[in-house]
């Protein structure tokens, strides 16, 4: 199978790799460049565990044709923390017990980051809508919604993080 | 079978490539096609992509608006001229789906998807293929022969310019809140006073979105009151054979269609 060269920015760092024709971005992130933070859930666009930001917009990496990120900027949870310091969203998730098994958490965090970047003071309804494409099957949604609202209240969740 | 991906900068080149490709499929936003690839769909041999800006344009053409086939649901929601379609785009998936899902892709979406196309059908939209200037195919005709249209590239969808956002009403009926696949969607365009000239379309009541022709006839000249719409509700599923699938049975769909149609026509909360 022919491979194609692709260059993009991942959490602020330049990446150059080869992708297979038809390969999805999630596969390239995890196996190609070693970023294991986006999770493989359903590969159908149903669960949201693989949500990443492409040029600031939320996208399902499992449904993104990898070669379409050529020249674009991709952000994952790996770019949220800054050294030992967690991102305010991550802090809020921790304080609100918004993760149990944690598998949905990377997708929830990136969906929340996308929301807060364009709407730093969302209402509860807007938070629910923002994570409406992300499924959680153990914690339940209330703690997650509370965490996102708390992070929004801190006022610093939108701009932090790399990429 | 390995898949081959071709990217073209010009829509004419993409159209030629698609028509000559063996087992070719056009790539819109990827929400349906990538899913098929992830599931190793062996029927796909070639994927044709197109980066021509014409696919991303929204422009006025007289009293109609041409929406490029590559315009996403998120872009529909952000476009003031398309405010009447924003509530329909908003109910499609979560934000990450809406960043990718396109108007053109939705035209080909099989049940339980294709809610946006249901609204387009109610709006008397028409489809313009690549290379066609000035002419277009009524969406109803397009849908009747949809399976055979896969070999052609859709350039844009033409819709009427609607200034009263209440003229287009839409409901997506799901069992899962806040988002889930529709067991039925209903769109009603009410361009005149009362039911005059109304167009009603159902999604997931047939293999493609379909008009509720009998209900439309019953509404002609009627007022949008409980009494005025009574005959239309009786005729809500006349001439249709709703499917039985994992979301609902034919019986259930027949039972609830008039209930949701009534709420829609009377403007009652869904």
Task: Please report, for each region that a protein language model flagged, where it lies by residue.
Chain B
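C-terminal structural segment of proteins
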Residues: 1-270
């Amino acid at each position: 199978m022919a491979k194609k060269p692709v260059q993009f920015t991942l959490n602020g760092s330049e990446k150059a790799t080869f992708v297979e024709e038809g390969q999805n971005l999630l596969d390239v992130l995890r196996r190609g460049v070693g970023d294991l933070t986006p999770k493989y859930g359903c590969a159908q666009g149903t669960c949201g565990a693989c949500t990443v930001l492409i040029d600031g917009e939320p996208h399902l990496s499992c449904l993104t044709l990898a070669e379409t990120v050529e020249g674009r900027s991709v952000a994952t949870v790996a770019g949220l923390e800054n050294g030992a310091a967690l991102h305010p969203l991550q802090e809020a998730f921790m304080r609100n017990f918004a993760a149990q098994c944690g598998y949905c958490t990377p997708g929830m965090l990136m969906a929340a980051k996308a929301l807060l970047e364009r709407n730093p003071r969302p209402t509860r309804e807007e938070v629910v809508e923002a994570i409406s494409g992300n499924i959680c099957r153990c914690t339940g949604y209330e703690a997650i919604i509370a965490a996102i609202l708390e992070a929004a209240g801190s006022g610093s969740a939108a701009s932090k993080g790399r990429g | 079978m390995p898949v081959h991906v071709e990217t073209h900068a010009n829509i004419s080149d993409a159209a030629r490539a698609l028509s000559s490709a063996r087992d070719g499929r056009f790539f819109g936003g990827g929400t349906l096609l990538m899913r098929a690839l992830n599931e190793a769909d062996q029927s796909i041999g070639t994927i044709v992509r197109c980066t021509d800006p014409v696919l991303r344009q929204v422009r006025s053409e007289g009293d109609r608006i041409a929406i490029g086939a590559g315009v996403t649901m998120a872009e529909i929601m952000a476009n003031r001229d398309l405010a009447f379609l924003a509530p329909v785009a908003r109910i499609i998936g979560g934000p990450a789906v809406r960043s990718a899902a396109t108007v053109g892709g939705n035209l080909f979406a099989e049940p339980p998807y294709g809610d946006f196309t249901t609204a387009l059908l109610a709006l008397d939209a028409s489809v313009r293929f690549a290379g066609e200037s000035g002419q277009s195919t009524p969406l109803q005709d397009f849908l009747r022969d949809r399976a055979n249209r896969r070999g052609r590239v859709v350039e844009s969808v033409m819709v009427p310019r609607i200034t009263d956002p209440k003229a287009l009403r839409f409901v997506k009926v799901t069992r899962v809140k806040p988002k889930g696949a529709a067991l039925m969607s209903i769109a009603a365009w009410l361009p005149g006073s009362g039911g005059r000239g109304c167009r009603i379309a159902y999604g997931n009541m047939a293999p493609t979105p379909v008009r509720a022709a009998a209900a439309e006839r019953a509404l002609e000249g009627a007022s949008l009151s409980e009494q005025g719409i009574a005959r239309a509700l009786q005729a809500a599923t006349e001439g249709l054979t709703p499917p039985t699938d994992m979301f609902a049975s034919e019986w259930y769909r027949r039972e609830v269609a008039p209930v949701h149609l009534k709420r829609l026509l009377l403007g009652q909360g869904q």
